[in-house]
A protein has these predicted regions:
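A short, proline-enriched helix->beta-strand linker immediately N-terminal to the Walker B motif
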Residues: 67-71
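Helical segment within the ABC ATPase nucleotide-binding domain
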Residues: 88-101
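Short, glycine/charged-rich "phosphate-handling" switch motifs in NTP-dependent
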Residues: 121, 133
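Short catalytic/signature loops enriched in Gly
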Residues: 39-42, 135-167
Length: 167
């Protein structure tokens, strides 16, 4: 919410989900921001979203997702609009948090590179239907469905001649 400080958003979430006091929520908010790699987290609680870079805003969203101490997080396009170096940092953060917290993550994305980087398994949906699923290596190396094949062929590689994509 662009009209609320980061601290207000985190505290509100913590108070509602964990039923803790405002003071405890503030301390937990600082811990959450620190855990997602936001430097100097305490003064950042009083900042508004527009005062953060895209990568930092994404870290705050991850902190918000972790506020209720979930077993599973669903991340919808978590790296969209981030440059490739920040994207890598966010993916590394997600992987690290999964290990530290024994956390499951479902990532919704169209980015084959993100899937290859972070996923163990992949499910491909087309027109609202599950059309293919399996281990990432299996699906990416030997896709069975035409939609999966077209997604993979849309990823540029340095060893191909340029060609027009079909729609």
């Amino acid at each position: 919410n662009p009209l609320m400080t980061i601290g207000k958003q985190l505290s509100e979430t913590l108070i509602e989900t964990l039923k803790i006091s405002g003071a405890s929520a503030r301390e937990k908010s600082i811990e959450l921001l620190d855990s997602v790699g936001i430097p100097n987290p305490e003064p950042r609680l009083d900042a508004y979203p527009h005062q953060f870079s895209g990568g930092m805003r994404q870290r705050v969203v991850i902190a918000l997702a972790l506020a209720g101490d979930p077993d599973l997080v669903i991340a919808d396009e978590p790296t969209t609009a981030l440059d490739v170096s920040i994207q890598k940092q966010i993916l590394d953060l997600i992987k690290s948090l999964c290990k530290q917290r024994n956390l499951g993550v479902i990532i919704v994305t169209h980015d084959i590179g993100v899937i290859a980087e972070i996923a163990d398994r992949v499910a491909v949906m087309y027109n609202g239907q599950l059309v293919e699923q399996g281990k990432v290596e299996q699906v990416l190396q030997k896709p069975k469905h035409d939609y999966t094949k077209s997604l993979i062929s849309a990823v540029p590689s340095g060893d191909q001649k340029l060609h027009r994509f079909t729609v």
